[in-house]
């Protein structure tokens, strides 16, 4: 997909589809009003006949003649007074999804009306970034082992229109960032959707290596089981004890900041399949346990985004990857292992394996003396029970970091909710 800005006036815009905003009060504003006037107030008729009511997610495609654009796409944006980045994202995603079902190859978005209500000082950046992210979100489809019923996507170019010179730079940056974030998110989803017989720890290594080889500031180190044993990572090795598929510890270093800058360390849980081990899970929906590596896939996606944008930071991405399966060599309930930190751990339930691999990964990551450490994991379904499907659980021993991550979630519509992590829980940990 090619993303670009378009500085031409409305009557000179050449595209298959021209997207404009329609709110539920029926009042056309800004660009929508100009497009309506240029087309004999055609849109007024659609609103009057209630062919478009301005509801979020409602989209209508109108053919026009005698213009440099072939179609006008009416994008429902809800209540004008409630317009927000979240509603804009929903509206844009719905419109792009509708357009992707046609054979149109290009689109220019003029869905700017109401942008002043977006709660962010850099509104141009937000509009363009969300536009690019939304395309990647709606265009993702799993194809590796599925060949039928796939959507044919003809759309090749998405532009965002502007008549302001000052906004061009911010719009371009937003498109660049949104494209990189969108592609990284697609990778995360793809790795999660792959079956466990393809997405093994070794496969994750190959994906990470391909990413890191593209950037001269990036290096990759992979620890095998013998190296982990030498480092006394017995907590992690106890989880993989029953598996024939070898465990891997991916350590990807990205040094593009100053030498004095302490790195940010990201650790992602990579259980490529979790049967529960000897403490076997119920068979119903066990196939979904291929998603127990989504902490790892998110870490690898973040790795791709950071290296593609060549961000001026130092970062280390650590992925402990293995399978948790039962066999005659598997760890048994009641076994005691000693972690890399020297802590002895009694394994009462082998289905509590996430904390075991993360314990050694977090201990190993400390040798980088990080500025901060972020751990991402599908650690327990109890978090979903507590928060539902809309918020990610956030726990931190730093109020400042927790606040920053919370604000990041708010500004990107990927929201978190902080859960307690106090001394009161120490005995249970």
Tell where the protein language model's regions lie, with residue ranges.
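Short amphipathic alpha-helical segment within the helicase RecA-like ATPase core
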Residues: 1-270
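A generic structural signal for tightly packed, nonpolar segments enriched in small/aliphatic residues
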Residues: 51-53, 57, 205-429
